[in-house]
Swiss-Prot record:
Listed Pfam families: PsbL
NCBIfam families tied to this protein: PRK00753.1
Gene from which the chain derives: psbL
Assembly information from the UniProt record: PSII is composed of 1 copy each of membrane proteins PsbA, PsbB, PsbC, PsbD, PsbE, PsbF, PsbH, PsbI, PsbJ, PsbK, PsbL, PsbM, PsbT, PsbX, PsbY, PsbZ, Psb30/Ycf12, at least 3 peripheral proteins of the oxygen-evolving complex and a large number of cofactors. It forms dimeric complexes.
Name the UniProt record assigns to this protein: Photosystem II reaction center protein L
Length: 39
């Protein structure tokens, strides 16, 4: 039971971290593109 629950929790954490990194990367790209277009 514990072996099955641990990988599931790890995958959930990886998905959350990857989602946060993706949002941060999109935010940075949006700022860079906005600066490029305004300049």
């Amino acid at each position: 039971m514990t072996q099955q629950s641990n990988p599931n929790e790890q995958t959930v954490e990886l998905n959350r971290t990857s989602l946060y990194w993706g949002l941060l990367l999109i935010f940075v790209l949006a700022v860079l593109f906005s600066n490029y277009f305004f300049n």
